[in-house]
A protein has these predicted regions:
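Short, surface-exposed, charged/polar-biased interaction segments
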Residues: 55, 59, 69, 91, ...
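Compositionally biased, low-complexity repeat tracts
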Residues: 9-12, 18-20, 116, 124-125, ...
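N-terminal interaction modules that seed assembly of large macromolecular complexes
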Residues: 27-91
């Protein structure tokens, strides 16, 4: 399965006509080191896929195939410099405003803190367009899997990543 994902992902990257996301995508992926930064926070690609599948609604695609397709979409999205930079922003904000200031007024993700949702919605829309904003709301409210364990910025950023990718998957199934 790993070999299949690797081959499929290489094919997706090779067939992409966007010069920023196509051939140069390796540069952006390494520039932000976003996958590695997320993993340091305990957020693995498999955990993201598992959370995505927590609210997956079948559109005629078997769960195993959907899981595989989502993994490919997530990996591809992480190579987009816009998505990666927004995720990086969430990582840094989480470190600065949540981890370093455990006793601050945002420790419990208060209602007046909106920037975390804005980041999540921006990631979702960047990947999946307007439909992804509604999908983001589902994941933000239910917080399946790893989302329930993350702080206020990363839970929304990862929910946005999931929402964008699931929205694209659903659109392709219709």
């Amino acid at each position: 399965m790993i070999i299949f994902l690797s081959i499929a992902f290489e094919h997706i990257g090779a067939s992409c006509h966007n010069p920023i996301i196509g051939e140069g995508s390796h540069y952006f992926s390494k520039m932000f080191e976003i996958e590695e930064r997320l993993e340091k926070k305990g957020i693995t690609i498999d955990a993201i896929v598992e959370a995505a599948m927590g609210l997956y609604v079948s559109h005629g695609m078997p769960d195993e195939q959907a899981s595989m397709n989502l993994k490919i979409k997530i990996l591809k999205s992480l190579k987009d410099p816009n998505v990666s930079s927004l995720l990086l922003g969430a990582v840094l904000l989480e470190e600065e405003l949540y981890e370093k200031r455990k006793n601050s007024e945002i420790a419990e993700d208060p209602v007046f803190l909106l920037s975390d949702e804005i980041i999540g919605m921006a990631i979702a829309e960047c990947i999946g367009g307007t439909y992804a904003r509604f999908e983001f709301t589902r994941y933000d409210q239910k917080k399946p899997g790893i989302l329930a364990t993350l702080g206020p910025f990363l839970d929304d950023a990862v929910a946005g990543l999931i929402a964008g990718c699931t929205s694209r998957l659903y659109s392709e199934c219709v």
